[in-house]
């Protein structure tokens, strides 16, 4: 919520207030558990404790999927969730990042994807450094450039038709709809050679 001499505004999410009133994050306060906001007819506002506070147990469903990704805390949490997947992903592809393409579905998974990519790039940087150091100065300039040229492979592999929402369909019709809701970017990977890693946050009714 935000209160000034001219306005009192309450919203379910902080970024909305920041955008409308052009406020820094420090100016928007959070109503704590057990508290209420009472606004009188004359404009006086009071924040009161109406119930003893209990343990805070935020819903991961809301933090991962429903909340606005433009909130600074939500953004950083989603990036961290992606970064934390790094080691398990590397194990699943046998640490073969040269034959693995990374992408995301749907667009709301993009923030976690950035965190995953940062984790993967940090891992690859360590591999490059260790390989160069292990050769004890015996590498030529061309060999060093070859090592440094290794990159995490990333592509926009699936493009969703924004008019179609699979989780609101029912039964067999949903399976048929889900099969056509994404358009694949053809030629971006080699069948039978490349691994494909997709980060997906469709936890409502993911397909």
Predicted regions and their residues:
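N-terminal segments that mediate ammonia production and transfer
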Residues: 1-189
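A phosphate-binding catalytic loop at a beta-strand-loop-alpha-helix junction
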Residues: 195-207
């Amino acid at each position: 919520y935000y209160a000034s001499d001219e306005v009192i505004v309450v919203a379910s999410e902080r970024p909305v207030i920041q955008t409308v009133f052009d406020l820094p994050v420090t100016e928007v306060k959070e109503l704590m558990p057990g508290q209420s906001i009472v606004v009188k007819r004359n404009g006086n506002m009071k924040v009161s404790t109406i119930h003893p506070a209990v343990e805070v147990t935020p819903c991961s469903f809301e933090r991962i999927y429903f909340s606005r990704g433009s909130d600074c805390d939500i953004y950083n949490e989603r990036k961290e969730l992606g970064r934390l997947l790094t080691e398990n992903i590397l194990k699943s592809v046998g640490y073969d990042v040269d034959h693995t393409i990374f992408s995301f579905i749907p667009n709301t998974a993009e923030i976690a994807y950035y965190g995953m990519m940062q984790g993967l790039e940090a891992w690859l940087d360590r591999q490059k450094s260790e390989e160069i150091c292990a050769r004890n100065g015996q590498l030529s300039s061309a060999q060093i450039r070859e090592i440094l040229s290794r990159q995490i492979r990333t592509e926009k592999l699936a493009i969703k038709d924004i008019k179609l929402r699979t989780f609101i369909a029912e039964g067999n019709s949903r399976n048929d709809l889900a099969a056509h809701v994404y358009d694949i970017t053809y030629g971006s990977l080699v069948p039978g050679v490349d691994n494909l890693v997709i980060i997906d946050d469709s936890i409502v009714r993911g397909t």
